[in-house]
From Swiss-Prot:
Its main location: membrane. Belongs to the ATG12 family. The gene is lgg-3. This is Ubiquitin-like protein atg-12. The record marks D87 as: Required for interaction with lgg-2. It comes from Caenorhabditis elegans. It comes from the Eukaryota. There is a cross-link at G118 (Glycyl lysine isopeptide (Gly-Lys) (interchain with K-129 in atg-5)). GO terms for biological process: autophagosome assembly; autophagosome maturation; autophagy; autophagy of mitochondrion; cellular response to toxic substance; determination of adult lifespan; glycophagy; macroautophagy. PANTHER family: AUTOPHAGY PROTEIN 12, UBIQUITIN-LIKE PROTEIN ATG12. A motif (LIR) lies at residues 90-93. Ubiquitin-like protein involved in autophagy vesicles formation. Conjugation with atg-5 through a ubiquitin-like conjugating system involving also atg-7 as an E1-like activating enzyme and atg-10 as an E2-like conjugating enzyme, is essential for its function. Most likely a component of an atg-5-lgg-3-atg-16 complex that promotes autophagosome formation by associating with lgg-2, but not lgg-1, at the preautophagosomal membrane. Probably, as part of an atg-5-lgg-3-atg-16 complex, required for lgg-1 lipidation; the complex acts as an E3-like enzyme promoting atg-3-mediated lgg-1 lipidation.
Amino acid sequence: METETATTPTGNTEPTAAASAEPPKSDKVTVRLRNIADAPVLKNKKMVVNPTDTVASFILKLRKLLNIQANNSLFLYIDNTFAPSPDTTFETLSRCYSVKITDKEILELQYSITPAYG
């Protein structure tokens, strides 16, 4: 790591670390899925997604896994209460709604093919 010097407001010079060229390593987001009502059951209920993935892209992946056609609905819910916006990233959802289970942060989502709440 290279060091540079910076001048403080009092006129002294202090060594500072140069900015790293690599972006900070982003962790994956672990998602646990649970079906509601008459939605098909997934074989693997845990998925790992990139934090930059959006809810809309995740719904497309989930549609393929569940063999749900484009003309049928698929609803996602958080905490059995509300649907996240399609343009929300999993980084935001994870920061706000993840729960800690055995030293791992897990985002719990519920899915349904019919409106379940409201």
